[in-house]
C-alpha cells in the first residue's frame, strides 16, 4: 500500500523544465488520448469523446464553460482535461468487495488521492460498521434503511448536513434540497461555498442577481476582455477558443494574475491549422503580474483614473445617462475614491508600476465594450467580496453592464455548480423560493438559515452534527484545514457518500459509513425500461439536457435520483405529500415540479428537449436590476492589503494542469515545467535569496494564524519560479492543511486559499 508521500516520488526526484509559453495544440490531444486509452478501451474512448458536449450527448463533468450554439459546435467539443475527466469516469477498472476485504479503512486513509482514484469505479453499496476497519457489502434496501433510521433518530433535523458537489445535475439537486427541507433543515452546504460564494454575494448586493450577465457572443464581440485571477489554459481550456474569437474580432485581452500561465500567453487551437502547424494566437496584449490580494487596489486605482479622465474631458469617459438612470450611490463612491486612494499604497499592494495601470486605463478608454472575467484568484481572498464589488463599480462607470459585448463573467469551475444553486442548494435560499416550495408541495419549509461548508465543519467539531450525506464530491479533501476537517468527519455518527469513484472522504468517515455507488454522466440511465436524462446549467445560464449511452459500470448502480428518492420515502413516509416514487420513475415529473417552483423554468420539459436547451432570463440584460431600490449599486470599498511579516511569504493554493478538482491524474504539471512530483513550492528567485534558501532545497511549509495552532505541510521542494515577488504557490489539496478553518472571506465565509501567510523551514 502506498501512502500519500510514497505515491509521489518526492520533490527531490522531480524534473524541472522551463514553463511553457503556450497552451493546447497537438500535445494536448496526445496527452488526452494517452490518458483515456490507459483508462478504458478504444471503443469506449471513442464513444465518450463523440458524445461530450453534443446536443444528444452528455455534459462534460468538468468545468461549467458554455457550449457553442447547435450548428457551431465541433465534432470534438471538449478540451484535454474534459477528455481525461470523462474517460476517467468511464474507466474499466473496478472497485469490488474483494478490494475492501484486502484494504482496511486505515490503509485507505493513508493513501494518496491519485492512488484512490486510480482503483476505478465503485460497483456496489458498502458499509463500515462501528468499530470495524473494513467496508463490507450491504444491499441497497439495507443501506437506505440504515441511513433513514439514523436520520429519524436525530433529536433535531439540524443534526444532519446534506452536501452537494457541482457534478450533480439539476434533478437530483432539486430532490435533495426538497428532502432536506421536508425533513426540516436548511443545512445544504455545497462546493460553491468554497469557490464562487464571494461572486454571488457581491453580485447580489450590486446587481440584484448572483450570476453573470454575458454570453459567449458577448466575449466574441468585446473590444476588451479582462481575465482576472484565473488560469483558463488548465481550468477552463475551452475558454481559450472564445478568447481567440475576441482576438479575431479585433478585441484586446488583459490578463491579471500572480503567475504567468501558459494559457494567458498563447493558444494553439488543435482544431485549426494555425494551431497545429502555426504559432497559434497570442492571448494577452498586456499581462499584469499582480501581488496576491492586490486586485482591489488595482480596480480602485483604475476607477480613480477614469474619474480623473472624466474631469479632464467631461462627458467623454463615463456613461452619465446610465449612471443617472440605472444606478445609485455614484457620488458617495466617487467621493470615497478621491479621498482614500493613495498611489504608494496601490503600488505596494499590487506590485505594479503606475505606468502599467495607466496603460490599462488607456486600453479601457479606447474600448466601447468590456467584459471582465474572474475565478478563484479573486473569490478566495479575504477581501474577495469588496474586490468584486469594485470590479462591478468599474463596469458601471462606462455602462458596461447589461448590453451586448460587455458585462461581468464569473467563470465557474464545476459543471453544474450554478444549476445546483438555482435548484435550491443553498443554506439561505430567499423566502420567495421557500414560499413556492410550500405552495407546490403543501409543507412549510424551515425559514432559519442553515450551515454552509465552513460552519458545517465547525458544527461537526462541536458535536452538533450526527449525519453527513454527500451528493458527489470529495468533501474531506476539498475543504480547508485538513486535520480539523478530518477530525470533524470522524466525530459524526454516520457519514454517507453518493459517489462514482473511491476518494479520501470514504476513508475519513464517521462511526458508521456508507458508500452509495451511482451512475456516471456518460452512462445510460434507465428507469422502468425508459431512458432518462438530467439537465445542467452552465456558467452563462444556459440549461440543457445530458444523457449518456455507455453501459453502467455495474448492474448494482443506482442513479442519484433513485438513491435520494428512496431515501426520502424511507425517511419521511407520508409526513409530506411528495410523490418520491414518481420522481424516480420519470425525471420529467421532477422537471414539471421545478417548472412551477423555479422562475425561468416554465414549460421545462418541452423547452429543454430542443437542441441546445434554453437560456434562463437575466433581468440585468433587460435593464432591470432586482435590488431593493431597483437600480444597480455603486459601493464604497475600503482599501486593504495582504501583508506578510519579514521572513514570510503569501501562499496561494492552486491546481496543476494534470488535475481536476481534488483528483490529480498524474504527478506532472507540464505547463509550469514540473514533472514527477506535486510536493513543490513555487517561489520567486529574489525571495529564495532573501530567505537564504536554495532552489531545490527541501522544506516544511508552516502557516501562521492568529489561533497559534501550527499547521504544517511536510517535505516539499522549493522551485525557483517567476511568480510575483513575496508570493508563493503550491498544489491543492495537498496544502489545504495550511488553510485555517477560521480564515475566511468577509461576507461569503469562503476559505482564503489565495493569501495564506507561511514560513519555509529547511528540513534536516
Model-derived segments and spans:
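Short Cys/His-rich Zn2+-coordinating modules
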Residues: 37-47
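Short, flexible, mixed-charge glycine/proline-rich loop motifs
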Residues: 48-54
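Short cysteine-rich clusters marking metal-coordination/redox-active sites
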Residues: 57-63
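Long, structured ligand/cofactor-binding scaffold of large enzymes
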Residues: 61, 135-224
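Short, non-ligating residues that shape and space the ligands of small metal-coordination modules
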Residues: 69-70
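Low-complexity, highly charged intrinsically disordered N-terminal segments
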Residues: 88-134, 144
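Non-catalytic alpha/beta scaffold blocks inside enzyme catalytic domains
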Residues: 117, 126, 197-404, 410-593, ...
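Long, low-complexity segments enriched in small/aliphatic residues
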Residues: 581-670
